[in-house]
Curated annotation (Swiss-Prot):
Protein's organism: Oryza sativa subsp. japonica
Protein name: Tubulin beta-2 chain
SUPFAM superfamilies named in the record: Tubulin C-terminal domain-like (SSF55307), Tubulin nucleotide-binding domain-like (SSF52490)
Inducing factors: Down-regulated by abscisic acid (ABA).
SMART domains, A to Z: Tubulin (SM00864), Tubulin_C (SM00865)
Amino acid composition bias (Acidic residues), ranges on this chain: 429-447
């Protein structure tokens, strides 16, 4: 079986991760003690993707939980599904990273990383044919960003040919938790560009907007935001866990979505959007799902796809539906909005269909788009970074942990390069390839 090893780090990562396991357990009919009480053989057919089956018949998530302070871990452990995880897989320190990337990456995190890697190794050895890793973390704090990227680079060294998928929560444009978010995020992106294969970009503000606008929640809690994220995470991997007519796995996803290796930051969407507790009463049609899924307001990160162009996109439909209708609808979207797709990648939208819908819904769809407009996110973080870095504000917290200013400069220029790469492909047309060949040769020389 093609197993996926799930790793969650830091406060944000652990909260999203805990929610994700609630969703996956519900889909596979596994209760809070790890026993199966579902009603369909299909739930068990490929349950090994995310679960180990223990000798006593209990299912244990292939999950590693890490943090530099015990608080969040304790709340996961005392939460509804706290007892389902393997107790040895909780790895935590006592000191905390204090929202400092350097502490997570170089000092506190580096002390704990070997303990985490031991658990990861143990889980990987338990797999029959490990397909890849998925990491949940935020980029604004210290642990998820600093230690998260440290772990990703260590796993990259040890398992170079396995897929590395991240669910990364970016700092929001208006809602800021800490002043040093732009530093932490830039240093993390610098790592993710090099070491991750696919990054699903999320951000709290876009999620707030969805809760507020679409779901009509007046005071959305983090629980509501995490509910949205977990629905998307479950959608991304549903093809691996259930039989379908058009299946895909992490590598197929990457092959179809990533035209150039560095451009692997995706925006995600989900349909139908329903608030927690009130599942939609009317059944949706494929055209309605498609329409909602491509709607710019439903993207889970603060970038507007109408400001750029899609290089590639992938849609995953769940439920009993006609594959023909799905294909027609997807073609329809591309024909009507052809200006939003680059013309030099024909047929750049892939669709997959999985027969089993999420719990409580008849049909659903998950959207993953590789759009050049994601540069808005990087650009925004970069501007905030530069404003502070120019004055060397807050820098002593990082240099005090042994970091060098040079590292900041490198991270900044790497992120700015990323923005201009997105811009270059946004402006490219099918017939001006002559100039590009020269540019690419120059770029090779610079590398």
């Amino acid at each position: 079986m093609r197993e996926i090893l799930h790793i969650q780090g830091g406060q944000c990562g652990n909260q999203i991760g805990a929610k994700f396991w609630e969703v996956v357990c519900a889909e596979h009919g596994i209760d809070a003690t790890g026993r199966y009480d579902g009603d369909s053989d299909l739930q068990l057919e490929r349950v090994n993707v995310y679960y180990n089956e223990a000798s006593c018949g209990r299912f244990v998530p292939r999950a590693v939980l890490m943090d530099l302070e015990p608080g969040t871990m304790d709340s996961v452990r005392s939460g509804p599904y706290g007892h389902i995880f393997r107790p040895d897989n909780f790895v935590f320190g006592q000191s905390g990273a204090g929202n400092n990337w350097a502490k997570g990456h170089y000092t506190e995190g580096a002390e704990l990383i070997d303990a985490v890697l031991d658990v990861v190794r143990k889980e990987a050895e338990n797999c029959d044919c490990l397909q890849g890793f998925q990491v949940c973390h935020s980029l604004g704090g210290g642990t998820g960003s600093g230690m998260g990227t440290l772990l990703i680079s260590k796993i990259r060294e040890e398992y170079p040919d396995r897929m590395m998928l991240t669910f990364s929560v970016f700092p929001s444009p208006k809602v800021s938790d800490t002043v040093v978010e732009p530093y932490n995020a830039t240093l993390s992106v610098h790592q993710l560009v090099e070491n991750a294969d696919e990054c699903m970009v999320l951000d709290n503000e876009a999620l707030y907007d969805i809760c507020f606008r679409t779901l009509k929640l007046t005071t959305p809690s983090f629980g509501d935001l995490n509910h949205l994220i977990s629905a998307t995470m479950s959608g991304v991997t549903c093809c691996l866990r259930f039989p379908g007519q058009l299946n895909s796995d992490l590598r197929k996803l990457a092959v179809n979505l990533i035209p150039f290796p560095r451009l692997h930051f995706f925006m995600v969407g989900f349909a139908p959007l329903t608030s927690r507790g009130s599942q939609q009463y009317r059944a949706l049609t494929v055209p309605e799902l498609t329409q909602q899924m491509w709607d710019a307001k439903n993207m889970m990160c603060a970038a507007d796809p109408r400001h750029g162009r899609y290089l590639t996109a992938s849609a995953m439909f769940r439920g009993k539906m006609s594959t023909k209708e799905v294909d027609e609808q997807m073609l329809n979207v591309q024909n009507k909005n052809s200006s939003y797709f680059v013309e030099w990648i024909p047929n750049n939208v892939k669709s997959t269909v999985c027969d089993i819908p999420p719990t409580g819904l008849k049909m659903a769809s998950t959207f993953i788009g590789n759009s050049t407009s994601i540069q808005e996110m990087f650009r925004r973080v970069s501007e905030q970074f530069t404003a502070m870095f120019r004055r060397k504000a807050f820098l002593h917290w990082y240099t005090g942990e042994g970091m060098d200013e040079m590292e900041f400069t490198e991270a900044e220029s790497n992120m700015n390069d990323l923005v201009s790469e997105y811009q270059q492909y946004q402006d490219a047309t099918a017939d001006d390839e002559g100039e590009y060949e020269d540019e690419e040769e120059e770029a090779d020389l610079q590398d």
